[in-house]
Amino acid sequence: MANQPRPKVKKSRALGIALTPKAVKYFEARPYPPGEHGRGRKQNSDYKVRLLEKQRLRAQYDLSERQLVRAYERASKTNMKTGEALVIELERRLDALVLRSGIARTIYQARQMVVHGHIQVNGQKVDKPSFRVRPDDVVQVRERSKEKTLFTIAREGGFAPDGETPRYLQVNLKALAFRLDREPNRKEIPVICDEQLVVEYYAR
């Protein structure tokens, strides 16, 4: 794993975002922010606000700090706004798109599917979660893995995301396959983040 183990609900509460379905249920049961029914919290400094936003982005893609820094460096060299380019860069990771497609339930599960060799791209096994998928690449579960329980659940829509599948993906869950039709644009990516604060954190 990219990060040290920590209870996902506790981590979700600290960051103010639901990282797993269990955390979603927790937030539904306790819609108030941490501290509202306990001792008050100090007002955060600008640095802490930026740090929190950076940590939130890291958590949603389950990245190490080094991985996020590398993605930021690549994004800063594009002709796009650095923040938008950063999120798009991360969204093209293989594990992120396995999650978006509905083949996996969480980013953690998606990462394990890739690492354990269950996923192929254009007919070739890829076991690196950081692999960057390109437009027109076809991603699917390997034939030898399709009868595993997890993939049987996925095939029946058990892991399908709430709402619409992102428009940049063409998904066939029955075949446990999807294609990246085009590069995502930031507004389509279901990530909770003010990426400009992340840029400000690294540019300080």
From Swiss-Prot:
It holds the Pfam family Ribosomal_S4. GO terms for molecular function: rRNA binding; structural constituent of ribosome. It comes from the Bacteria. InterPro entries: Ribosomal_uS4, Ribosomal_uS4_bac-type, Ribosomal_uS4_CS, Ribosomal_uS4_N, S4_RNA-bd, S4_RNA-bd_sf. Signal peptide: none annotated. CDD domains: S4. GO terms for biological process: ribosomal small subunit biogenesis; translation. The keyword Ribosomal protein applies. PANTHER family: 30S 40S RIBOSOMAL PROTEIN, SMALL RIBOSOMAL SUBUNIT PROTEIN US4M. One of the primary rRNA binding proteins, it binds directly to 16S rRNA where it nucleates assembly of the body of the 30S subunit. With S5 and S12 plays an important role in translational accuracy. Belongs to the universal ribosomal protein uS4 family. This is Small ribosomal subunit protein uS4. It comes from Streptomyces coelicolor (strain ATCC BAA-471 / A3(2) / M145).
